[in-house]
Amino acid sequence: MGELMAFLLPLIIVLMVKHSDSRTHSLRYFRLGVSDPIHGVPEFISVGYVDSHPITTYDSVTRQKEPRAPWMAENLAPDHWERYTQLLRGWQQMFKVELKRLQRHYNHSGSHTYQRMIGCELLEDGSTTGFLQYAYDGQDFLIFNKDTLSWLAVDNVAHTIKQAWEANQHELLYQKNWLEEECIAWLKRFLEYGKDILQRTEPPLVRVNRKETFPGVTALFCKAHGFYPPEIYMTWMKNGEEIVQEIDYGDILPSGDGTYQTWASVELDPQSSNLYSCHVEHCGVHMVLQVPQESETIPLVMKAVSGSIVLVIVLAGVGVLVWRRRPREQNGAIYLPTPDR
């Protein structure tokens, strides 16, 4: 199960995290049913996450809901785990029945998957969102609209199920209430339990380097790593103007130590004298790495401007910018030259 979780977590994180400086907290539960599973894969798995942190697991092998975070085990009584274990055993059987029914409808045999994701988000401004959806073989199948109390069906098979589910008004109202009230209440509760982990801030280490991506094509890469929470905004500016259409972005991925990494790149025009700068925002702090022309020789310059950190870096020696929160009205940076490769 540990190896499977290690495989599932990065896939979920890629879907969950976007390039944004606005801090959002989320609670999500993923359930996966597999027909004819390969060796080592349970036929039913349920995992819970607060933000990107796994908090609970259940699978058809152990048949027990268990905590995945110490602060969950410390704060929830044994009867909580037993109660939800019984509920998930029911979900396990339900998924098995529904997956067989879908295979009959589609005339499928062999190994197929049925997935459910339910959860909510608490945004920085206090507003909330909620979501509930199903997928078959990794493709959207049914999506719940809590505002209209209806399901969006993607094909005729899904439409048949949609009609049956929408006939149960009590269940629709229950799902709406769970998404808008119960889920948010649980999320706030879990955020308090794990506040030392979930509400911490670790600033990114940022560096810029120049790389030949193809023969005759050179790109600037702005790379950030070691940061938490995963919400971060990165962009390139050319001559002081943002160039969104010219930028390639990497996914925000876990680094394996509880922090995250990502990058943004832009191709250089070798015939121009454009001035490029990488802008990074994380938890309200803004950094600018100004990149001089390759032919220039400029000493390292760094200064704080209106709460921002500005660093001019010569690319002949790639460097890393480390920034940390300082006492109010004090911002600073430490420049750490990287060893030669």
Curated annotation (Swiss-Prot):
Which stretches face the Extracellular side? 23-302
Record has Zinc as a keyword = no
Which Gene Ontology CC terms are recorded? early endosome membrane; endoplasmic reticulum membrane; external side of plasma membrane; extracellular space; Golgi membrane; late endosome membrane; MHC class I protein complex
Enumerate the residue ranges of region (Alpha-1): 23-109
Where found?
A: Cell membrane; Endoplasmic reticulum membrane; Golgi apparatus membrane; Early endosome membrane
Task: For this UniProt record, give its keywords in alphabetical order, as a comma-separated list.
Answer: Cell membrane, Disulfide bond, Endoplasmic reticulum, Endosome, Glycoprotein, Golgi apparatus, Immunity, Immunoglobulin domain, Innate immunity, Membrane, MHC I, Signal, Transmembrane, Transmembrane helix
* Domain of life (superkingdom): Eukaryota
Residues given in the record as 8-(9H-purin-6-yl)-2-oxa-8-azabicyclo[3.3.1]nona-3,6-diene-4,6-dicarbaldehyde binding sites: 29, 31, 65, 80, 116
Residues with glycosylation annotation: 107
Extract one GO BP annotation from the record.
innate immune response
What are the start and end residues of every segment in region (Alpha-3)? 202-293
Q: Where do the Ig-like C1-type domain residues begin and end?
A: 203-299
Which residue positions does the secretion signal occupy? 1-22
What binding partners and quaternary form does the record give? Answer: Heterotrimer that consists of MR1, B2M and metabolite antigen. Major classes of metabolite ligands presented by MR1 include riboflavin-related antigens, pyrimidines and ribityl lumazines, nucleobase adducts and folate derivatives. Forms reversible covalent Schiff base complexes with microbial pyrimidine-based metabolite, which serves as a molecular switch triggering complete folding, stable association with B2M and translocation of the ternary complex from endoplasmic reticulum to the plasma membrane. Alternatively, forms non-Schiff base complexes with ribityl lumazines.
The function of this protein is: Antigen-presenting molecule specialized in displaying microbial pyrimidine-based metabolites to alpha-beta T cell receptors (TCR) on innate-type mucosal-associated invariant T (MAIT) cells. In complex with B2M preferentially presents riboflavin-derived metabolites to semi-invariant TCRs on MAIT cells, guiding immune surveillance of the microbial metabolome at mucosal epithelial barriers.
Instruction: State the family it belongs to.
Output: Belongs to the MHC class I family.
Mind telling me what this protein is named?
Major histocompatibility complex class I-related protein 1
**UniProt source species:** Pan troglodytes (Chimpanzee)
